[in-house]
Amino acid sequence: WQTDFSYFKIIGWGWFYLSTILDDYSRYIIAWKLCTTMKADDVTDTLNLALKASGCDSAKVIHKPRLLSDNGSSYISGDLADWLDDHGMDHVRGAPYHPQTQGKIERWHQTLKNRVLLENYFLPGDLENQIGDFVDHYNNHRYHESIGNPADAYLGRHTAIIESHSHH
């Protein structure tokens, strides 16, 4: 799983930070949370949402997802390290000044911002609604050359789709 924060400014409200968990293989957005800070608690809140959404919080899995992040202060905090230990998750941090390591999530945030910044949002709830709508569009309708859409790849439907196309 890749994770990162992205910034949004709402006039009259200040800065908001979007914490996202993206599945590295499929590019599927598993979970996201709009936060007023970028602390370890914001990361663990988003991770809890992702574990629940993916079923990893209740299923018996041999390997929990591994977290890939940059070296931002919330990701190098001892609190996050303890939380990951408690949940049996490994953490890999990209090399400093090498954003390509998290290329997929950087690209996701860029795509989201290009779309959402064109819209008018005046309240945090408006921004949250815009993000939610775009996550749904991105996961279920946006086509990627190599995998179809992220939901198909994440849920394992893409192989059946590829096979059905090859028989035509």
Language model feature labels by segment:
Residues 4, 21, 27, 47, ...:
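Mobile genetic element proteins and their domesticated derivatives, centered on retroelements
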Residues 64-71, 85-104, 118-122:
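RNase H-like polynucleotidyl transferase catalytic core
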Residues 1-22, 45-49, 53-56, 62, ...:
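Mobile-element integrase/transposase regions
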Residues 78, 85-89, 110-168:
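C-terminal domain-tail junction helix/linker
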Residues 47, 59-77, 95-97, 148-153:
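Acidic/histidine-rich, metal-coordinating catalytic segments
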Residues 23-24, 34-41:
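A short acidic/small-residue loop/turn micro-motif
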Residues 18, 39, 43, 68, ...:
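Hydrophobic (often cysteine-bearing) scaffold residues that line and stabilize catalytic clefts
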